[in-house]
Amino acid sequence: MSIIKITDLNLLNKKVLIRSDLNVPIKNNKISSYARIHASLPTIKFALKNLAKVIVTSHLGRPTEGIYKKKFSLFPVFKYFKKILPETNIYFSQNLTECSSIKSGELIILENVRFNQGEKENSKILSKKYATLCDIFVMDAFGAIHRNEASTNGIIKYAKLACSGLLLESELKTLNSALTNPVRPMVAIVGGAKVSTKFKTLTTLAKISDTLIVGGGIANTFISIDHNIGKSLHDPKFIEQAKILKEKYNIFIPTDSRVSTTFTYDSIATIKSTSDIHANEEIMDFGDISIKNMINIIKKAKTILWNGPIGVFEFKNFSKGTEQLSKAIASSDAFSIAGGGDTLSVVEMFKVQNNISYLSTGGGSFLKFLEGNKFRIIELLEKHFNKFKNNNF
C-alpha cells in the first residue's frame, strides 16, 4: 500500500483541506465524548505547526441532505476547538466560498458536509467544489473510509494532490499488522446484537485468531444451536452458519448467563446454566463461570482484538460481563485493539481508555477492514502517490 503521508509534504502557505471524523455524540448542544476529536488533533496540529492554511470538514449524524438542522451542526465542535487551541485563530464557516481569505496558521471548521446537496451520492459537481478549496487534500477519517461520498471519495479524484493524515496512517498500519502478523496467542472478542451484520467479521476472526469469544445476541445465536434460549435476542437465519463456525474453529461460547423475565434498567438478574433457560427468560449477560473462563483466556493472550459489548452493559445488573472484559483487557500485557460500534462507549464508561494499546475510531469501517474489504478511497490515494513520485510538489 503506497500512499503519500502528510509528513512527506511541504505545507507552508498551502491550503490544506482535512477530512476528519468529528462525528461525536452531541446532546442538548453538549458533546458527550471527545474521543474522535482528540484522535483527529495530531493531523490538524501538524498542519498548523507547518503554517498551512487549514480547513477541516466532517460529517455529523444523519441529517436530511440539503436541510439544516441545529442538532446536526458542527458548531459545538468548533467551540471545543476554540477551547483546546486557544492560540490559533479559528473560524466557523457554513459556506464553502468563505475559505479564500484564510491565512497561514489559521483554521476554518466547515459545517457538516451532509448538509451539502450531493454529498452522499458522491456528486461530481460537489466533489469539484471541495477540490477547488485546497492545494492538498488530506484524508484522515478512517471512520468514513468505507463511504464513497463527495468529501471522502469524489474530492480525491479532482484534488491537485491527496494524502493520508496521521490518524488514517496509524489506523491502517495498526490494523493491518494485527490481522496479518499477530503475536500469538491471538484472542478476538465480538459482541453485539446480530450475527447478520457481523458474520463476515466473525468468519475472518475465527480463521485468524486462536480463540474467538462471542457475546451478546451473537453468543445467543451460538447457544441456540444446542439449547433453548427463551425469548433471547438472536439471529435464527444464521444458526446453520454459526453451527459450521462452531464445529470448525475454536469459539468460546458462554455456558452460564445472567437472565431476566423483563428488559428494563432495574431488571433482576438470575444466573443460570445456558442449558436451563426457560421460555419466558432472556439472556442479557455472561454468568460468573463464563466471566472467569473468559478472563483466563484473555490473560494468556499476546494480541487482543475487541469489538462490541458482551451484554446489556447499559443496565446495571447486566454490565458485569462487559465491565470485567474491559478491565481484563486493560490489565493485560497483550497488544490490544478496541473499536467499532459501542466499544468506545464501553471503554469510556469503564474508564479503561488509557490502558488499551490502540483505540480505533472506526465503526462500520473497522468491521469492513476486519472483513478484508478493499477500499476504493485507498486505491484513489495510491494513484496520487504515483503522481507525487513522478513530480515534485
Swiss-Prot record:
Q: Any idea which UniProt keywords this protein has? A: ATP-binding, Cytoplasm, Glycolysis, Kinase, Nucleotide-binding, Transferase
Q: How does it assemble?
A: Monomer.
Pfam families tied to this protein:
PGK
Provide the catalytic activity annotation.
(2R)-3-phosphoglycerate + ATP = (2R)-3-phospho-glyceroyl phosphate + ADP
Q: Name one GO biological process term.
A: glycolytic process
Predominant subcellular localization, coarse grouping: cytoplasm
Mind telling me which GO cellular component terms the entry cites?
cytosol
Its EC number is 2.7.2.3
Name the pathway.
Carbohydrate degradation; glycolysis; pyruvate from D-glyceraldehyde 3-phosphate: step 2/5
Say which family it is in. Belongs to the phosphoglycerate kinase family.
- Which cellular compartments is it found in? Cytoplasm
Keyword set includes Membrane? no
- Which residues are substrate-binding? 21-23, 36, 59-62, 114, 147
Q: What is this protein called?
A: Phosphoglycerate kinase
Query: Gene name on record?
Result: pgk
Sequence positions that bind ATP: 198, 314, 340-343
Which Gene3D superfamilies does the annotation name? Phosphoglycerate kinase, N-terminal domain
Name the SUPFAM superfamilies for this protein.
Answer: Phosphoglycerate kinase (SSF53748)
Which GO MF terms does the UniProt record name? ADP binding; ATP binding; phosphoglycerate kinase activity
